[in-house]
Amino acid sequence: MNHSAFRNSQDTFLSDALAGLIANHPDARWHDVGFIGRTTPLRTADGDPAVAVISGGGSGHEPMHAGFVGQGMLTAACPGLLFTSPNAVQVSEATQWADQGRGVVHVVKNYTGDVMNFTVARNAAEAVDTRTVLVADDIATDGNEDGPGRRGTG
């Protein structure tokens, strides 16, 4: 079987993918501490500061999670390395950056590394009112007797 990939280099695929996404979305900006955030302030319909929403996860499925940064969706996204959770520093920095005094919601997949690092980040950003929504409905591997079994589920 011939496998091919749509990338410049396996060494730069993540930075290339994120650069392409940012070039195509003027409301997105890369922050060197490791997250993509909106460039326009998040506001409610009344013009007041809004609750920020942050997510993240391992790279390799671009534009997942950064592709959800935008109006009415994520305020920031923290991409981890290839199939690796984002680290707690990335998430903590994104949390503190995104907070406008109304708090932050972390949308976290129920994957061990994501849960652990988002929890550590929440504790590190203790000045920010942070709540967590745990997503635990992945059934991609359900019924596959030869595979590792279900992942990311409670």
Task: Give the positions of each predicted feature.
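Glycine-rich oxoanion-binding loops at beta->alpha junctions
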Residues: 61, 68-101, 138-140
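Structural motif
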Residues: 50-53, 81, 102-106, 129-132
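Gly-rich Lys/Arg/Thr-decorated short loops/hinges at beta-loop-alpha junctions or inter-strand turns
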Residues: 1-2, 17, 48-56, 65-78, ...
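Gly/Ser/Thr-rich loops at beta-strand to alpha-helix junctions
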Residues: 58-63, 109-117, 152-154
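N-terminal amphipathic/basic leader segments beginning at the initiator methionine
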Residues: 1-53
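Core alpha/beta catalytic barrel or barrel-like domain that forms the active/cofactor pocket
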Residues: 65-66, 108, 130-141
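Short alpha-helices
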Residues: 113, 133-154
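Short Gly/Thr/Asp-enriched flexible loops that form oxyanion-binding sites at enzyme active sites
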Residues: 115-128
